[in-house]
């Protein structure tokens, strides 16, 4: 069996053999892994695949294996969030997206590695050790959904689910040379996803091609009454896969090509824009003046929400519990021992931003900036159909290179976090290489206009071969 297959190819292979055999081959590949992409491999995957064979399931993903980020609840599998404090926590319920996947016949291979509580851009803060980039095992895969991107790039799953709070699907997609989509806020239910920053995050798919992104979105998107932010947009994603950008208007925000961008990244992205132009699209430069404040606004809002969300992890009801002479001592010791350095840093900064003397100065000001950033997107997208820019300003960096310098690491999100503030859809698609490392093109669209984003990405992909390249480290 080929190591890298599209969903259509996997389904064809299942017809030729069985879901059980295909799943077994993926599990064999996982067993030989060099990337540390999985925290947990499901012991029930083969049983689940065999059941699909016996029952003759005819769902859109019948027998197709998938990997799940370890902050998305799956009954019977640990949901650690990459943290010691939830190392042994097994949820008693499925996330909404998992229910949708199971109903479609998908086989869950396991739970993927991630930055602790999704706080990071490199998957180095995981309690279970860093994940390696399949293109260079000494480099990071990006984060926080680094495990999900790495296993797709390494051929250890045909596709995966991640979550994106400030770039956590798109960053690893760019670093690992795969496709990753952050849907419009509200398009995919967050029910059953352990919250980092509720107002920013969305569940999103990662795959080796744009078609499989659309296939997965048709399964997981839709209204969920258990999620108060859920919206039923009735979008049909696969119908957007039209190889035609004639008449498509592309906006190029100059602020996304700022100081510090790698020259090869800038060149590859411009080549991609000109390729779309050759195929019939037009482009114009647009300005988004408040983008320069987005990174600071994002981190204040995200850390503030995190400080509130993570207050629930105290060892009382579930997860790791340290011993203490009384309840207060137990909680203090549990949180001190259970959380990693980066998580504790963000809890402290978020608590500070929400404190009485600084709430107006920091948090409320960040919310005002968020509104201005959203207005920048609205204005720019009123003139064009999509925006195009680099996903990440630089290629993947070496493991350990930035982990001791949090400010430098935070700057990695400069091109991705504005999209989460605005709530618009954004996709990263491979568009080139520099020194053997992948480069991602970021395509952004109007709220719930994933079809325009997918159309642009699909057309670019069909007329280039970047998505067909495979990492030599794991070939």
From Swiss-Prot:
Organism, scientific name: Methanosarcina barkeri (strain Fusaro / DSM 804)
One GO process term, biological-process aspect: translation
Highest rank taxon of the organism: Archaea
Keywords: ATP-binding, Ligase, Nucleotide-binding, Protein biosynthesis
UniProt-recorded name of the protein: Glutamyl-tRNA(Gln) amidotransferase subunit A
Matching InterPro entries: Amidase, Amidase_CS, Amidase_dom, AS_sf, GatA
Enzyme superclass (EC): ligase
UniProt-listed Enzyme Commission number(s): 6.3.5.7
Reported function: Allows the formation of correctly charged Gln-tRNA(Gln) through the transamidation of misacylated Glu-tRNA(Gln) in organisms which lack glutaminyl-tRNA synthetase. The reaction takes place in the presence of glutamine and ATP through an activated gamma-phospho-Glu-tRNA(Gln).
Quaternary structure annotation from Swiss-Prot or TrEMBL: Heterotrimer of A, B and C subunits.
One Pfam family linked to the record: Amidase
Active-site residues from the entry: 69 (charge relay system), 144 (charge relay system), 168 (acyl-ester intermediate)
GO cellular component, one term: glutamyl-tRNA(Gln) amidotransferase complex
Family: Belongs to the amidase family. GatA subfamily.
Catalytic reaction equation(s): L-glutamyl-tRNA(Gln) + L-glutamine + ATP + H2O = L-glutaminyl-tRNA(Gln) + L-glutamate + ADP + phosphate + H(+)
A molecular-function term among this protein's GO annotations: ATP binding
């Amino acid at each position: 069996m080929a190591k890298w297959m599209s969903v259509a190819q996997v389904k064809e292979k299942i017809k030729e053999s069985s879901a059980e055999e295909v799943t077994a081959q993926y599990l064999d590949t996982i067993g030989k892994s060099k990337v540390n992409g999985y925290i947990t491999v499901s012991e029930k995957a083969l049983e689940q695949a065999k059941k699909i064979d016996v029952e003759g399931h005819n769902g859109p993903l019948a027998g197709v294996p998938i990997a799940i980020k370890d902050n998305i609840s799956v009954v019977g599998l640990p949901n650690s969030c990459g943290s010691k404090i939830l190392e042994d926590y097994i949820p008693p319920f499925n996330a909404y997206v998992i229910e949708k996947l199971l109903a479609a016949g998908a086989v869950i291979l396991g739970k993927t590695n991630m930055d602790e509580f999704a706080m990071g851009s490199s998957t180095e803060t995981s309690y279970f050790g860093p994940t390696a980039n399949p293109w260079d095992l000494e480099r990071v895969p990006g984060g926080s959904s680094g495990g999900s991107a790495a296993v797709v790039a390494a051929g250890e799953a045909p596709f995966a689910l991640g979550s994106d709070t400030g770039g956590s699907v798109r960053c690893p997609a760019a670093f690992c040379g795969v496709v990753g989509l952050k849907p419009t806020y509200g398009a995919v239910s967050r029910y059953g996803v352990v919250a980092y920053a509720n107002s920013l995050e969305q569940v999103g798919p990662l795959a080796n091609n744009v078609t499989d992104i659309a296939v997965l979105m048709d399964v997981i998107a839709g209204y969920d009454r258990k999620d108060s932010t859920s919206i039923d947009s009735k979008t049909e994603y696969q119908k957007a896969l039209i190889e035609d950008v004639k008449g498509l208007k592309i906006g190029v925000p100059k602020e996304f090509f700022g100081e510090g961008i790698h020259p090869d990244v800038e060149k590859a992205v411009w080549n991609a824009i000109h390729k779309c132009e050759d195929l019939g699209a037009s482009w114009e430069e647009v300005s988004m003046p408040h983008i320069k404040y987005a990174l600071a606004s994002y981190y204040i809002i995200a850390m503030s929400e995190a400080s509130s969300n993570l207050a629930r992890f105290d060892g009382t009801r579930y997860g790791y519990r340290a011993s203490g002479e009384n309840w207060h001592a137990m909680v203090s010791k549990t949180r001190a021992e259970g959380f990693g350095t980066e998580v504790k840093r963000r809890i402290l900064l978020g608590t500070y931003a929400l404190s009485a003397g600084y709430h107006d100065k920091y948090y409320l000001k960040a919310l005002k900036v968020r509104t201005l950033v959203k207005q920048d997107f609205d204005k720019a997208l009123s003139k064009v159909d999509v925006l195009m820019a680099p996903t990440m300003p630089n290629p993947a960096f070496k493991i350990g290179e930035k982990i001791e310098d949090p400010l430098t690491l935070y700057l990695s999100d400069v091109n991705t976090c504005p999209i989460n503030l605005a709530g618009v859809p954004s996709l990263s698609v491979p568009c080139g290489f520099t020194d053997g490392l992948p480069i991602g093109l970021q395509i952004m669209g109007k709220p719930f206009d994933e079809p325009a984003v997918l159309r642009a990405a699909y057309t670019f992909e069909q007329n280039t071969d970047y998505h067909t390249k495979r990492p030599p480290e794991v070939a």
